[in-house]
């Protein structure tokens, strides 16, 4: 079971274009990978975080119901958060390590600033449609 | 020698004790001014402080006038008739001339009487002085009489050589109690005037310090007023980060005006698309600059930004998360932009829609932040108040994140507009937006500078207007003239 998940995870990693990250995949990263692919829109959040509340509100306002993982309530939350910070640091986000982090269709979109920017430049809606989160 | 010193010391003590009792007596019936009026001319009608200066001046003038005085006293001024001067001239006669130079004006008299005391045993010397003084005083008396002084001053002069009790006894002359009393009074008057001078100088000094403090305050207020650019009253406790931002924003506004006129002339001159593109790109870079400045300011003073103290009042009316609402830009544009293709219109409406959704999301987040701040502060502290405050502070620090995201949203909206529109349309669009905000700022200063009567008559506005704003409005009102 463990072996199966791992091989599946690393496969998905390389297919997602994470490249080198997949090679040094640790448990945190693997957990992110598996959680992110479970739903069309996945948000890694902290239950008390107001910006996380904002991003959840954004998707709900667009008619999307995202899968939300509150890391402060999650048994492996610490691991996942550390892995997310590393992931965002690599993706060149302006605010590395800041939650929320959004995955659409199993692909990393980024933190709040990336989500907002892609919504304004009109790339978010097609992404959501492709992932099957939006029909209209 | 020891005796001399003893007598000196006791004399000093005596002199130090004497003034205070005498000063009170003198202050009550103003004998010193009486002396001046009596001995001098009627022109010595000065106030208390000026009197001190006059006396001081007299002393200096006396020292200056010494050589001619000794040489014959032809140039003696009427003021030298002041009864205390004979003692001084006595002291500064040729044998003592070297000492007289070092004798300062302030402690002169106190030292002086001590020295006179020490000279006392040299009776031949002092008697010689008396002899020398005698004609000199007569001279002075004569000169004073010629200058139209009252005759009383002349009668005063002759007994002066016998001013010292001990001198009088050594020289075997009878001492005149009345003269002694007058001399003592003179000495005390001189001392009193010195004290007054000291007080006056101290008063001047403190006034000077006060003045320089006021000047500094004025300078500060003026520079802050400059930073604010008339955008509002400078806060009494403005932080340095906020002040720097206000200054930078003032500069940015100047740049903004420059960019606006550049775009305007560019559009009017029918520049080529490439030239116009340079101007539009320059404007977008300038627009990005304000977000960089705000990011720095939000780190320094998040509250200054979020309540928009740096904006003009009318701009503040539309404030949303430390700036304009991105969707407002499109509201401004829609009525003003023409010749848009169907695709462009679709793009703009879609932009308006997504910016509204993003605004709504951020507003929800900020609402949640406020709610959690309320919950944190309203709850009675579980462990101690400091921990509660630490939690609240942590929440406030999240405000910075919201300002950053809102600015990101504004910035992205402007960039998206640029992508949707052609260069010429974009130039027109930014001109419309720039002119709109220019008018909004002009409206603010008009509102602030509306006549005071309106403020006074309109009771409701009076209630909502703070004193500062009234002051501000009157200031602007005057500056307009």
Swiss-Prot record, chain A:
Gene name, per UniProt, is GRXC7
Name of this chain's protein: Glutaredoxin-C7
Q: Does the keyword Electron transport apply?
A: yes
Q: What happens when the gene is disrupted?
A: Plants show a reduced number of petal primordia and abnormalities during further petal development. Defection in sporogenous cell formation in adaxial anther lobes when associated with the disruption of GRXC8/ROXY2 leading to fertility defects.
Q: List the disulfide bonds.
A: 49-52
State whether it acts alone or in a complex, and with which partners, per the record.
Interacts with TGA2, TGA3, TGA7 and PAN. Interacts with TGA9 and TGA10 in the nucleus.
Into which family does the record put it?
Belongs to the glutaredoxin family. CC-type subfamily.
* One Pfam family it belongs to: Glutaredoxin
From Swiss-Prot, chain B:
Q: In which tissues is it expressed?
A: Mostly expressed in stems, inflorescence apex and flowers, and, to a lower extent, in seedlings, leaves and siliques.
Q: Where is this motif: Nuclear localization signal?
A: 165-172
Spans annotated as Basic motif: 178-198
- Give the UniProt entry's GO cellular component terms: nucleus
The bZIP domain is annotated at: 176-220
Q: What induces it?
A: Induced by flg22 in leaves.
The residues covered by the DOG1 domain are 242-450
Q: Give the start-end ranges of region Leucine-zipper.
A: 204-218
Cite the entry's keywords alphabetically.
Activator, DNA-binding, Nucleus, Transcription, Transcription regulation
- PROSITE patterns in the cross-refs: BZIP, BZIP_BASIC, DOG1
* UniProt xrefs under SUPFAM superfamilies: Leucine zipper domain (SSF57959)
Provide the phenotype resulting from gene inactivation: In the double mutant tga9 tga10, reduced male fertility due to defects in male gametogenesis, with early steps in anther development blocked in adaxial lobes and later steps affected in abaxial lobes. Microspore development in abaxial anther lobes leads to the production of inviable pollen grains contained within nondehiscent anthers. In addition, multiple defects in the anther dehiscence program are observed, including abnormal stability and lignification of the middle layer and defects in septum and stomium function. Reduced SPL levels in anthers.
Q: Which GO terms describe its biological process?
A: anther development; DNA-templated transcription; hydrogen peroxide mediated signaling pathway; response to molecule of bacterial origin
Subcellular localization, per the record?
Nucleus
Ranges of compositional bias, category Polar residues: 110-126
Query: Which GO terms fall under molecular function for this chain's record?
Result: DNA-binding transcription factor activity; protein homodimerization activity; transcription cis-regulatory region binding
**Pfam families linked:** bZIP_1, DOG1
Q: Where is this region: Disordered?
A: 91-181
Protein role = Together with TGA10, basic leucine-zipper transcription factor required for anther development, probably via the activation of SPL expression in anthers and via the regulation of genes with functions in early and middle tapetal development. Required for signaling responses to pathogen-associated molecular patterns (PAMPs) such as flg22 that involves chloroplastic reactive oxygen species (ROS) production and subsequent expression of H(2)O(2)-responsive genes.
Give the quaternary structure. Homodimer. Binds DNA as a dimer. Interacts with floral glutaredoxins GRXC7/ROXY1 and GRXC8/ROXY2 in the nucleus. Interacts with TGA1, TGA2, TGA3, TGA4, TGA5, TGA6, TGA7, TGA10 and PAN.
What is this protein called in UniProt? Transcription factor TGA9
